[in-house]
Amino acid sequence: MSFDNAYEAITEENDSRWAFGTGFEDPLSGVDTTVPSGVDGARLAAYCLMLGDDALIFSHRLQEWCTNAPELEDEVAIANIALDLLGQARLLLARAGKADGSERSEDSYAFFRSEQEYRNVRLAELEGGHFGHLIARLLVFSIWRLALLQRLQSSVDPVLAAIADKGVKEVAYHRDYAAQWAVRLGDGTELSHARMQEGLDAVWPYVDELFAAHEVEFVESPSLRPEFDAILDQVLAVATLKRPETGAIAGVSGRMGRDGVHTERMGYLLATLQSVAREHPDATW
């Protein structure tokens, strides 16, 4: 099956492309994945891997909140946000395997890489905490990711542009959901305000990493900071919250998540994420 454009192809309804472990089709089936002239396929693959890992790892952390949210409505909302990010991860990892010519599958990327081979920002792998921690992480992550995806809508790679275009619609909701809860908690009771501020304080040391320049980029990360700050400040003002002043957590010799250097939490996360696939690598069900 072929399509007139990449966006039409990746948004076409085809359930067989979304069923794990049942012989599903490539999520980019029917999409022209030819790397445009003048674009380095290896660099494109590396960049898609970064963004795909961000989505995959943060999706996993959100899934851990299933049955733990304060209301049933929020159970559904958080689960849907996790599924949105998982869908983005699938498309981006599949694009990486096509762009560099390796034909490596999304499952191979997700389940058969070591911790040091993952390229997600460390913010995505932070665990646990209370609901205020979750909302703070989601707020920061979604404000940043939406600004990034909006710029990628004009990417020279039509497949990446289509993935970004689809993602913008999803992450706009994620950002709005997080902002509404940040205001509700921050401008609520004394306890809810304290919890939300605690969440922001905990996540803040990992914010600078989101805007650190990297040798492989299709959008200059530092250019996203002004928009991020402006939007976050608007939310904080309405929520009566303070911008944290804690410093950034440095990497190892300047190396951070994009370089495969992660927090100690990452190993435990991958042990859970990859356990079934590694124990039964050829299983189908």
Q: Which residue ranges define each predicted feature?
A:
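A contiguous pocket-lining binding segment that forms or flanks enzyme active sites
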Residues: 159-219
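Conserved alpha-helical segments that form or flank metal/cofactor-binding pockets of metalloenzymes
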Residues: 3-12, 82-112, 179-181
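Alpha-helical scaffold segments that form or flank carboxylate-/histidine-based iron centers
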Residues: 41-50, 69-88, 134, 159-171
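Internal, conserved structured core segments that host functional sites
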Residues: 123-177
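Extended, helix-rich structural scaffolds rather than catalytic motifs
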Residues: 194-285
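Extreme N-terminal leader/anchor segments
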Residues: 1-40
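Helix-loop segments that flank and shape redox-cofactor active sites
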Residues: 58-80, 145-160
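Acidic/His metal-coordination segments adjacent to aromatic residues that form catalytic metal sites
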Residues: 29-47, 111-138, 155, 185-189, ...
